[in-house]
Amino acid sequence: MHEILTLQLGQRANYLATHFWNLQESYFTYSEAEETLIDHDVHFRPGIGADGSETYTPRTLVYDLKGAFGSLRKHNALYELSTDADPGQGLWDGKEVIQRQTPIIPSEYQKHLEQGLPAPVLSSDTVRYWSDYNRLFYHPRSIVQLNDYELNSKIMPFEDWNVGEDLFGELDKEHDLLDRDLRPFAEECDQLRALQLFTSSDDAWGGFAAKYVDRLRDEFGKKAVWVWAIEGGKKVQRHNQLKRDMNKARSIHSISPQSSLYVPILDPPTRLPKTISLDAQSEWQTSALISTAMETATLPTRLRSYTDFETSLAGEDGSHKIFELQSKILPEDMSNHTRPFQNPEDRGTHKSKGESSKVRREFDLDFSYDDPNNGDSHIFNQVQVGRGYSPEKEVPESRKDLGLKRKERFYNSEPMLESFYIPLAFPILDSSPRNMFSVRHKDAKINVLAALTASSRTATKLKAMEAVAGRVIGVDERENLVNGLGEIRESYETVWMSDSDFDDD
């Protein structure tokens, strides 16, 4: 078994992660005759409920601020023991004055789930919190509320990167967060494969995540750490945008070198195809769109047939850790479309007669950058994942040939490419927007092609960050941040030296 532990840091991260977990729950089958391609033990843990019944809950830690959990309780129906209506006053014989905060009323969607009724149609108006469309029970240890700050507070906003960094330091000093929160989940794993983090990177959660990843790297050594770093894509006032930009720069400078995979995600993306209808002001809708690409791109990590996803990301030398997230929604009739190939029993880079052996530059959705000029960029490494359609009949090379092909690509300065195909289509659940996609199957599913791409576009983004940091950041921090961003940028630049360059030397 190769388990993956997940950490969810903050409101925007929890919106995206809730869609992710709802999708994982939808893959469960309840009949021995039904087989699934998904190994549920990767993300779910068995346990015992309060009444002695068996449970199956996510391997995750959900961090958020006070007031951000909505109607979600730490102790749910699986783990809640019945208590006496009047427990008595014990040794105290004086008057009691009990003050309780007004509880948040569960959404109609949650009420219907609890009663076993058909779920009502959700809308941007009816979703107030990420818990309003959550379909799972979590273990009580998974729910971690940080009471030092309150959601959307005007008095103490959780916005500055240093605030998150300081909060983690204070909590870790008092409680040892890894020992208190993460270790119980880690000790349950037979063979921990990776740690996956959902976090926003342009506010205080970026600082919190940076300190957390630093501790994870100390504790878990060479284990893979995958970070989904959410950045606000909506327009804001200039001074707020500068603050966001500096928070993003600090996050990518501190977190990406410690990560195996760092994916900046624009929420929402700048450009949308005509086939997608999106309420850009709704976090529920924008995170649902992101989940189609993010969940598809990582689907190989959950297959029963083990895939060495980490090697695919590493490319030839493992120097590129910042990847772009891109996707394309494909029509049901795939007869005239490009198709990546992956035999469920044999994984590898390969060439074929069609376009499936070539890297893709054009996608309908680009979740990482708002620069439309992608044609001139150099691609170092790309992992493509296609789902929901039958691949063209192609014969992959043997494993013996794959290493040679990879070396040939490297020495010829060609992009490293890995393609996966999974016949499981992306399901449109009742917890997601119903009419977001105009192209979909009759059975409420869609075909998706997603990609994780390491390219020279990252160098352009980092260079812009350096310029802003040089103007805005204080003197004490400026040199370290600008130089650090410059060192990361060098890995994503393409520098060609001719023979005359050497002759001049």
Swiss-Prot record:
Biased composition (Basic and acidic residues): 344-358
Subcellular location: Mitochondrion
InterPro entries documented for this protein: DML1/Misato, DML1/Misato_tubulin, Misato_II_tubulin-like, Tubulin/FtsZ_GTPase_sf
Region (Disordered): 333-358
GO cellular component: mitochondrion
Biological process terms in GO annotation: mitochondrion organization
Swiss-Prot/TrEMBL keywords: Mitochondrion
Family: Belongs to the misato family.
Function of the molecule: Involved in the partitioning of the mitochondrial organelle and mitochondrial DNA (mtDNA) inheritance.
Protein name (database record): Protein dml1
